[in-house]
Structure formats: C-alpha cells, structure tokens
Amino acid sequence: MLSFFRRTLGRRSMRKHAEKERLREAQRAATHIPAAGDSKSIITCRVSLLDGTDVSVDLPKKAKGQELFDQIMYHLDLIESDYFGLRFMDSAQVAHWLDGTKSIKKQVKIGSPYCLHLRVKFYSSEPNNLREELTRYLFVLQLKQDILSGKLECPFDTAVQLAAYNLQAELGDYDLAEHSPELVSEFRFVPIQTEEMELAIFEKWKEYRGQTPAQAETNYLNKAKWLEMYGVDMHVVKARDGNDYSLGLTPTGVLVFEGETKIGLFFWPKITRLDFKKNKLTLVVVEDDVQGKEQEHTFVFRLDHPKACKHLWKCAVEHHAFFRLRGPVQKSSHRSGFIRLGSRFRYSGKTEYQTTKTNKARRSTSFERRPSKRYSRRTLQMKASTAKPEELSVHNNVSTQSNGSQQAWSVRSTLPVIPSVPSGPVLAEIENLPRNPGSNQYDRKWVSAASDCCQRGGNQWNTRALSPPQPAHRNYTDFVHEHNVKNTGVHHDVHFPGHAAMTEI
C-alpha cells in the first residue's frame, strides 16, 4: 500500500514539475502558441528562428513533425516553405531534419521541451526564382550565419560587398551627420573582422545609396550565389583506403573532396544506386570508357555512426528529388506480401520545379525585419575617406598580394573550398587548385545544373577505393580537351528531367 501511494504521489509530482517547466519555457520564448487540452496530453516544442527569436508551440503528444512545421510557417506567414526545414540534434550529436511523416517524440529524444532550429534546407540554385520578399530575407539571414560561423567562406572583396548590403538593408542610406566609421564595428559579419575590413565596408556602403532593403537583399543573394561553397551540404566520410574524404551534396550532384582538393563530381543522372547499411554508404556510378561503353564504378564510404550514415543517405535522396525531379515519387498503393528490408523513407515535399511554377507572390505582404545584435564599438586608428561615393574605391583599403590577387582574410575552416569554374555543358579541368579563397580569377558558379556527365580530375578513379592523388600526366591537358569535345555533343539542355537518374533508392 505504501509503495502504491509513493508511486502515485511521485507521478503527480513529476507531472507538476513537467507542467512548471513547460510554462517556464513558454514564458522565456518571445511567442507562445498554446494548444487545447490538459498538460498530460501536451508536449512543448521550442523553435529558434533565423532572426534570433524563439517560438514555443504546444502540440498533442502524438503530433507529427508536419504539424509543428505548419504552425511555424503559419506564424511566419511564409508561403515558400519547401526551402526550409526544422533541425535538431540527437544524443550522438548528429544533426537531423525533422521528418514530417513521423511523430515528434519518436524523432527528438531530448525533451520536453523539444528544441529545434528553423534553417534553410535547400539553397535555391537561382535566388531570383524566390518570389516572396520574406523568403529572400530569411535566405539572407541564413547566409549571414553561414559566413559568420565559417561554414561558408568568401574572399575579402565579396565579404565587404555582402556586409555593405547588410548595412544598407538594415540602416538605410549613409548619413554623414549620423554615421561614422566606428559604426561598422558594432556588427559582426565574418569570423575575423579587422579594422581594415570595417573601413572597406564603410566606404562600400556609401556606394549603395538609394537601395531599398528589398533591393539590397536581392543584390546580396545574387552576389552570394557565386561563392564556391554556396548551398553545398558537406559530410565527412572515410573510404576503403582509410583516408578521410568529404561528400558535398549540390543541386547538380555529389562533390568529392580529398582534403581541400575537389577530385570529382558525380552528376545525379550518372548515379544508378545509392544505399546504406549500418555505417557504410555505397555509391554506384556509370561512366563511359575510352571506347564509349558504359562501365560501373562502385565507391564505398564509411561514417563514424550508423545514424550519421542514414542522415547522409536521406539528405542525398532529398537533394536529388528536390532539384532533379518534376514531382516527388509517389508511393505504391499496394503492399508486398514479402517482408521488406531497408528504409521506407521517401521525399514527400514539393520539388524546386513545383515551387517555382506554382507559387505566386502576393500583392502585398508585411513583416518586420529585426535589428542585428550589436557589440561595443572599437576606436578606429585608421581614418575613413570623406570623399563622395562615386569617387571612392574599396581597393584603396584592401591589401593585395604581389601577383595582384586578393589576400584571404579568414582562418580556414574545416570545410574544403572548391575553385570557381566557368559554367557550361563541358567538362571542367581540375588541376592546380588555389589554396586561398578569392585567389581564382573567375567569379562564377562552380557547376552548371545542365551538365549531365561525371566530372573527374587528373587522378585515375579506382572502383574499390579512392587512391591518393598522383602527379598529372604531361599530356593531361590534351586528354581533357579531347574528352571535353566528345562530351559537348552528348549533353542536353534539360533543366528539370523526369524520374530518371537514381534507382534503388
């Protein structure tokens, strides 16, 4: 009898404690969205938005991920929601995207409250296709975080221009009587922000006079889309040879890096199979040999944890479906009589083709741009120029190397940097890659989405493992030129092909 009372009172006290914690978390959040029902049947989810605010949402215990996502989209009044997702960390510190078809409690094990973050899931290959001003604003906030955290590197000149666009969008036109060079030091744009960069940003800001916040954000996105690592979802893996590699998921295909050197690009139409088992990911690629016959190449990668392997596989399936297909693959209505092994995961959202074709911008939308976090000012030792904007040149405040290329300003992150190459339906040469961001003479996107071939560097691919890089042959340039000419005639200008490409996924 005593044990019964202890269990009963213990459960009651636990429920009261959970209810107090839920109310406390709801009070901390800037916005609280309640749900009908008693505390026993409610869970609390706390979502951090891109502008730094928090939203606390109460949902039924058996609520699925799509219900929480819909609540956040309704709160933001966001129509182009397919570019975004809710992200959370598991107990193994592996990041996951919330699956809308599954229960929240079965996915997010740490809680309640269950903490998630709103993030850009698919970076638009062409930001001009984003119809809503609110969508472009959220993209800018995400890119600002990527650059500040070091995830997305950019050269000095590009960083100065992007920061100046941020100032123009947030503060408006430069005013001589109100704004001083020290103002820039109150903001944070890059991991290592020097006084020299702040003066360059201040001078560049003067040149953007007259731009509205919407225009400045559009110019920001059109500049940021040419960064080499824009929209690349990186995953660290190990190959059979024991070396570390990185796989980057892009709208075009899967990039392969060895250290900071890009050694290959598997285009989605050339990938015939992509599956996983425990912590092993298998990638099968079809490529034409010298005689024009198709040959299969199998690559096996290993990850540190089975959950990380499944997460990489799911991200690859979603990237392929979103950027390559006209619509998601429909699930078969009949069930097989046999036991089915493997994951049943399928991408169920809209594709980029559907998003750009169906979404229409509203006539009038209103939202509030929240100010950036401010820091204490620094006393600048260098003086900014007081000349007119048309007489200013950012290059006066930028140090250059002896060969005329721009110095890299930031500490290199763990992510590799790929050189920018001119887009077009031909193979791109991958040799003599620059070690510093911004040292390339080109300022273009890395790969055109219309290219439907497998790109390789000067190294010979091994069907079992990725071998260490070997010195390029002296006739390598002629070899690449011949294959470029050959592949020029087999490309097709199809931007959104059908359900071909990936099988057995």
UniProtKB/Swiss-Prot annotation:
It is found in: Cytoplasm; Cell junction, Adherens junction; Cell membrane; Photoreceptor inner segment. Residues 394-406 have a biased composition (Polar residues). Plays a role in the formation and organization of tight junctions during the establishment of polarity in epithelial cells. PANTHER family: 4.1 G PROTEIN, BAND 4.1-LIKE PROTEIN 5. PROSITE patterns: FERM_1, FERM_2, FERM_3. Component of a complex composed of PALS1, CRB1 and EPB41L5. Within the complex, interacts (via FERM domain) with PALS1 (via HOOK domain) and with CRB1 (via intracellular domain). Interacts with CRB2 (via intracellular domain). Interacts with CRB3 (via intracellular domain). One of its GO terms (biological process) is actomyosin structure organization. Pfam families: FA, FERM_C, FERM_M, FERM_N. One of its GO terms (molecular function) is cytoskeletal protein binding. Keywords: Cell junction, Cell membrane, Cytoplasm, Membrane, Phosphoprotein. It is a peripheral membrane protein. Residues 29-119 are annotated as: Required for interaction with CRB1. Its main location: cytoplasm. GO terms for cellular component: adherens junction; cytoplasm; cytoskeleton; photoreceptor inner segment; plasma membrane. Residues 43-327 form the FERM domain. This is Band 4.1-like protein 5. The modification Phosphoserine is found at S39. It comes from Canis lupus familiaris (Dog). Residues 357-406 are annotated as: Disordered.
